[in-house]
Amino acid sequence: MTKKLALKRRGKDSEPTNEVVASSEASENEEEEEDLLQAVKDPGEDSTDDEGIDQEYHSDSSEELQFESDEEGNYLGRKQSSSAEEDEESSDEEDNEEEESTDGEEVEDEEKDSKSKQTDDKPSGSGAASKKALTAELPKRDSSKPEYQDSDTSDEEDIRNTVGNIPMHWYDEYKHIGYDWDAKKIIKPPQGDQIDEFLRKIEDPDFWRTVKDPLTGQDVRLTDEDIALIKRIVSGRIPNKDHEEYEPWIEWFTSEVEKMPIKNVPDHKRSFLPSVSEKKRVSRMVHALKMGWMKTTEEVEREKQAKRGPKFYMLWETDTSREHMRRIHDPVSAPKRDLPGHAESYNPPPEYLFDAKETKEWLKLKDEPHKRKLHFMPQKFKSLREVPAYSRYLRERFLRCLDLYLCPRAKRVKLNIDAEYLIPKLPSPRDLQPFPTVESMVYRGHTDLVRSVSVEPKGEYLVSGSDDKTVKIWEIATGRCIRTIETDEVVRCVAWCPNPKLSIIAVATGNRLLLVNPKVGDKVLVKKTDDLLAEAPSQDVIESERIKTAVQWSNAEADEQEKGVRVVITHFKPIRQVTWHGRGDYLATVMPEGANRSALIHQLSKRRSQIPFSKSKGLIQFVLFHPVKPCFFVATQHNIRIYDLVKQELVKKLLTNSKWISGMSIHPKGDNLLVSTYDKKMLWFDLDLSTKPYQTMRLHRNAVRSVAFHLRYPLFASGSDDQAVIVSHGMVYNDLLQNPLIVPLKKLQTHEKRDEFGVLDVNWHPVQPWVFSTGADSTIRLYT
């Protein structure tokens, strides 16, 4: 009976706090486990200890029995618990019958247990010896191995990582992943490669429901309840499946408003009788009316109206009143005048006094005084008593009064913008090479200013026209003058035919246009050109009198034939400019004094001329052919018009906002136009973007005479009266959404100034990144 009660108490009250779970290897050690179980059941055979199955173990014992092996100890615990359960089932009836009779015995057993517990605390007790013997028989675990190395199941949930709520990637560089309750490192489980991952995907049917625990690095299999919970959260439903979303509403409080009086006291008797105080007040008011002391409302209003008098309303009364209130509550003080500077002193420093050039510029702006930097001219006196009266004093005081009286005042928030922020970020010129940087050659031979220059399509020869009435043909590589053609008048413009199959130079001198065969280069090409210009083709079209009076075609005379002149086109006014079409069959001339016949188009193959315009819309300064489309650019003094030669209509009108246009150059692709003006500006037009300039460049100090695009490289150049040739980078992208990139690269200033003239014309080499410039110093310079 005592044995059964002890087992019962052991199963209910004194369960061990540290449970050991059996591993899968218990079946391999059955013999050792049976011996160990036999030793526990028959303690008399293995030890002299008075402990047995009746002995009760408590967790607070200083020398508590501990199992060193998970397998054997857990097996022993399972055997004992199963035997205890069998004893309990077999002796339930006996325990119920003898429960009352054994109360005394239980007390005695407890006393014995306490005595045996005291004896167990002693090191010389037999219980300690039996524990040591039992511990020695159990195999010890290797502490160097990770606790979950032998099993990849999730049964070792008692292992806890104590690192806390920290990012686990902090342990990526270490072999362990944290620390357990004994402050021992938790070694990371072995990680497979991609092949292992692929095999697990194929072989493991539960791979899709396996997740990795970031605290321990183990693979955790999700249960059906976990998956159902995840599905409910993903679908946006309540995680708890037992929750009823549409359960019936219970009205804990009524929704009907019940109106009930706070108090239901019956009215007093005096509420039905007239008020005595009101009766006295009315009697006093009646007496005041009889005596004339009190006036009616109409009489009071009439007296107020008489005091106010007639009232007149302003048409904008609301606005004036609002402005009046604003001035009262938020007044804006008048701006103070600028304090006088050193330039206004009666004895200013010498650097503040005007020199001859500054005085001339100041006097030149007499009609536009607002453009002057100073409204007066600084003067110097020896003493203060020599300073005369200020002649502009009354006028300046009067203008100051007008500003204070008439100019509206308003507060403006000043924007503090860094100047560097407004400057666009441009690439370095070193990254945009090649471009001309130095002067390589000077062509000398003319005796007067050189007005025009043109290059052969192959880039071997150069032609120039000068005011000394000569046309010179140069060899570019050596700088040698090959041929000189003398004319009767000043040569205004020369242009080499862009067709490489012909060798023709158009020379504009006076009112004659000469078509010259330079007799340089390929002899076959020279002969072919002579054959083309030898005889005039038959005319199938009858020319009008308007064209006949404007232009006449004729063959050159014998003396001119020896010089190379083949055809002479005589105009009725002096020619200023000549330009070729890209194919080399058409050329156009400009006569600024020709009114509505200022621009003429000539066809070389048929020796026929046309007047494209019947009315004059300004003085034509420059004309140009489109390189791709049948369009004709006509520049007047202020605007540029683009005409379609096929449809014979105006396509677009470009607004330059300049005083006088000097020249034009079109990009080889035909979508961008560069314009030079006499008011120191260069205008870049994007023909697909707008009719206004895309960018205005003020790179020169004087009038810009000429501009030119390179045929192959993204370069353009400009020449000005400040003796400078400025080379710039002009990249045009195929992407229409990307704006052109314009970067000034190099300023080449080697020409000399003559009679306020500098560089008159610029032109590019057709193949190399070289630029030619002509100047008033009668030289032609090559920059490479």
From Swiss-Prot:
Q: Where is it located? A: Nucleus, Nucleolus; Nucleus, Nucleoplasm
Where is it found, in Gene Ontology cellular component terms? nucleoplasm; PeBoW complex; preribosome, large subunit precursor
Region of interest (Disordered), ranges: 1-159
A Gene Ontology biological process noted in the UniProt record is: regulation of hemocyte proliferation
**What PROSITE patterns has UniProt attached to this entry?**
WD_REPEATS_1, WD_REPEATS_2, WD_REPEATS_REGION
Enumerate composition-biased segments (Acidic residues). Answer: 27-36, 45-54, 62-73, 84-111, 149-158
Q: Where are the WD repeats?
A: 445-486, 488-526, 570-612, 615-653, 656-695, 699-738, 754-784
Keywords from the named record = Nucleus, Repeat, Ribosome biogenesis, rRNA processing, WD repeat
MF terms from GO for this chain are: ribonucleoprotein complex binding
Q: Which domain of life is it from?
A: Eukaryota
Q: Where is the composition biased (Basic and acidic residues)?
A: 112-123, 138-148
Query: Which residues lie in Basic residues bias regions?
Result: 1-11
Cross-referenced Pfam families, in alphabetical order?
BOP1NT, WD40
The UniProt similarity line reads: Belongs to the WD repeat BOP1/ERB1 family.
Q: What does this protein do?
A: Required for maturation of ribosomal RNAs and formation of the large ribosomal subunit.
Designated name of the protein? Ribosome biogenesis protein BOP1 homolog
Originating organism: Drosophila melanogaster (Fruit fly)
